[in-house]
């Protein structure tokens, strides 16, 4: 069975790149009828926070990426938090020592840093091996460690050989002999390093495939060596392309919202975000762009992942979000907009009226947040000043008087007031309606004017005309 994992560190909010990685793993697992596992890599004690872990889970659920095993629901291969697996890492580090494939290092951190600086000063890459650390493994130093209650770090003895990696996305990647020296797998405080914990966890959790960002490619040689040391078969690994901003530079905050939390707050729908992320480095075989989660699951395959960097285009995301807003019914949009209406202090007259407003403006929305400036005039009278031609002004004030005494408030009756007055006053219909739109909304464009007039109602329309032109 296919088993994949998404293994974030709870040190911040879920970024666009991380969310895409989670999505690709999810789509791959579901396409093959496999399992999607959530593992929390929280061994960075100083930066890991519970609030970020909670947000990661809520964000994944908001995106619809529900896991089959994880820290909250458990599973057959737990625990699913690395901080709860420290005894496991220690056990497997000792196994490598017993196999003479790892060794204890009694050098203090500052001594290791001194070695590093000396190598750099000689123009050498800081590669370590046993011989460098042997001078520190004296009886005196070991006794000193014991007296202080310290534990030695454990380093892996990197084989002096080349490694070949057959990447699911990039093809054959070769790591030359000596490209990596010995490296720490367990720190003196008992915390594992990333590559060691990753290999032990993937091995014990029976992960079959790993899809991750290409920034992890340099880690692959260390991980392949560790699998070999454990006589274990590594999972099949694929490295997906980097996400760049529209300017071709690595995606960052200067390109706008880059965390999923920010996108959610700005009124993007989860279906649109997921759909757009899927197209960052992957394409459907039928070139379809708007797809449901199920459609993406059915179409997804690793061989359609691109080797080239993907461009994150906020304008394309907004366009796609607009498509999803237009396909969402008014009842759902009403529920989605409720917290925003409270935030903006927009008080609807009643539920039916609000839904009619939503129908009038939804084609103009790219995000839910757009509702604030597209539909604000329905809730708040615009504060404007305008110089209006005398005849137009007279015609509009006459309309206001007629609207106040109107018996019926249906669309046809209201429109007839304007038509008859325009004809009687012999004014330009185009100029009249343009002025009316501005007087009622404070804008020169927007929803259909007939919808605006009907939703505001004859009394409100008359009041706005008189307050500005009277």
Swiss-Prot record:
Catalyzes the attachment of glutamate to tRNA(Glu) in a two-step reaction: glutamate is first activated by ATP to form Glu-AMP and then transferred to the acceptor end of tRNA(Glu). It comes from the Bacteria. Its main location: cytoplasm. It holds the Pfam family Anticodon_2. It is found in: Cytoplasm. Keywords: Aminoacyl-tRNA synthetase, ATP-binding, Cytoplasm, Ligase, Nucleotide-binding, Protein biosynthesis. Monomer. A motif ('KMSKS' region) lies at residues 250-254. One of its GO terms (biological process) is glutamyl-tRNA aminoacylation. Its EC number is 6.1.1.17. Coiled coil: none annotated. Belongs to the class-I aminoacyl-tRNA synthetase family. Glutamate--tRNA ligase type 1 subfamily. The keyword Phosphoprotein does not apply. GO terms for cellular component: cytosol. A motif ('HIGH' region) lies at residues 8-18. It catalyses: tRNA(Glu) + L-glutamate + ATP = L-glutamyl-tRNA(Glu) + AMP + diphosphate. PROSITE patterns: AA_TRNA_LIGASE_I. This is Glutamate--tRNA ligase 1. ATP binds at residue 253. The gene is gltX1. GO terms for molecular function: ATP binding; glutamate-tRNA ligase activity; tRNA binding; zinc ion binding.
């Amino acid at each position: 069975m296919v088993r994949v994992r998404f293994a974030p560190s709870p040190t911040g909010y879920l970024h666009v790149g991380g969310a895409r990685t989670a999505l690709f793993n999810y789509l791959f697992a579901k396409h093959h009828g496999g399992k999607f596992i959530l593992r929390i890599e929280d061994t960075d004690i100083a930066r890991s926070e519970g609030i970020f872990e909670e947000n990661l889970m809520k964000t994944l659920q908001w995106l619809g990426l529900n896991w089959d095993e994880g820290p909250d629901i458990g599973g057959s291969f737990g625990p699913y938090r690395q901080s709860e697996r420290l005894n496991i890492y220690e056990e497997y580090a000792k196994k490598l020592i017993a196999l003479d494939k790892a060794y204890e290092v009694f050098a203090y951190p500052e001594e290791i840093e001194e070695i590093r600086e000396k190598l750099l000063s000689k123009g050498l890459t800081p590669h370590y091996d046993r011989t460098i650390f042997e001078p520190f493994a004296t009886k005196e130093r070991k006794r000193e460690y014991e007296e202080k209650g310290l534990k030695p770090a454990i380093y892996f003895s990197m084989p002096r050989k080349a490694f070949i990696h057959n990447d699911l996305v990039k093809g054959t990647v070769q790591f030359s002999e000596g490209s990596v020296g010995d490296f720490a797998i367990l720190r003196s405080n008992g915390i594992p390093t990333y590559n060691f914990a990753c290999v032990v966890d993937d091995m014990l959790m029976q992960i079959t495939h790993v899809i991750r960002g290409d920034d992890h490619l340099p880690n692959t040689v260390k991980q392949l060596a560790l699998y070999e040391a454990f006589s274990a078969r590594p999972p099949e690994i694929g490295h997906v392309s980097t996400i760049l901003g529209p300017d071709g530079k690595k995606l960052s905050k200067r390109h706008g919202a880059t965390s999923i939390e920010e996108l959610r707050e700005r009124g993007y729908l989860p279906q649109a975000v997921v759909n757009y992320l899927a197209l960052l480095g992957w394409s459907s075989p039928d070139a379809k762009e708007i797809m449901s989660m199920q459609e993406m699951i059915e179409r997804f395959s690793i061989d359609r992942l691109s080797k080239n960097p993907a461009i994150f285009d906020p304008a394309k995301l907004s366009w796609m979000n607009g498509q999803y807003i237009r396909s969402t019914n008014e009842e759902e949009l009403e529920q989605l907009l409720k917290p925003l209406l409270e935030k903006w202090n927009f008080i609807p007259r009643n539920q039916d009226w609000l839904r009619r407003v939503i129908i009038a403006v939804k084609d103009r929305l790219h995000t839910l947040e757009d509702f604030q400036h597209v539909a604000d005039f329905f809730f708040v009278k615009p504060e404007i000043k305008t110089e209006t031609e005398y005849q137009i002004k007279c015609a509009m004030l006459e309309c206001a008087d007629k609207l106040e005494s109107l018996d019926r408030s249906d669309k046809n009756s209201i429109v007839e007031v304007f038509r008859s007055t325009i004809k009687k006053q012999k004014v330009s219909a185009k100029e009249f309606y343009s002025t009316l739109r501005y007087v009622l909304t404070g804008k020169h464009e927007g929803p259909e004017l007939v919808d605006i007039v009907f939703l505001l109602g004859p009394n409100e329309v008359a009041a706005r005309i008189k307050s500005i032109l009277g």
